Curated annotation (Swiss-Prot):
Coiled coil: none annotated. It is found in: Cell inner membrane. The keyword Cell division does not apply. Belongs to the ATPase B chain family. The keyword Amino-acid biosynthesis does not apply. InterPro entries: ATP_synth_B-like_membr_sf, ATP_synth_b/b'su_bac/chlpt, ATP_synth_F0_bsu_bac, ATP_synthase_B_chain. The gene is atpF2. This is ATP synthase subunit b 2. The chain crosses the membrane at residues 20-40. GO terms for molecular function: proton-transporting ATP synthase activity, rotational mechanism; proton-transporting ATPase activity, rotational mechanism.
Amino acid sequence: MLTSGNILLAGSLLSPEPGLIFWTTITFVLVLIILKKIAWGPIISALEEREKGIQSSIDRAHGAKEESEAILRQNRELLAKADAEADRVIREGREYAEKIRAEITEKAHQESQKMISAAKEEIEQEKRRALAELRNEVADLAVRGAEKIIRGVLDADVQKKVVDSMIQDLSTNRN
């Protein structure tokens, strides 16, 4: 209906009528009862099941987190142990190398001392042999000189010549 440019709606849903309110309330209650009997149980059980699934996922996530933290701690401990072991091995290696170096140095020192001692002994033996040889030659020269002196009377010039000749003989025999 149209009056003076306004539209009036008769029997509109927005106008409160007692019959409409009554039937709407009854329909609402019936729908609630039907939903409670038919759909409410499955919806609630689905929500509970979903809640259990979410809780289970959360529990598994917490368990996985704790497990990963335990593994991380264990890995850190193993890494610390490995570092300590590596440090120990390096330290022992250095100590062993130092010990070997000291032993080699000591052996080299002992060998050099042996060689020096052997060389000194050899020099001493050569010196003794040379002195013995020199004594023998001097004794031979003295005997020969005495022989020549005994054979004849010598004057100073002759004695000088004899001594010079013995020295020359000595130097020729040594070479």
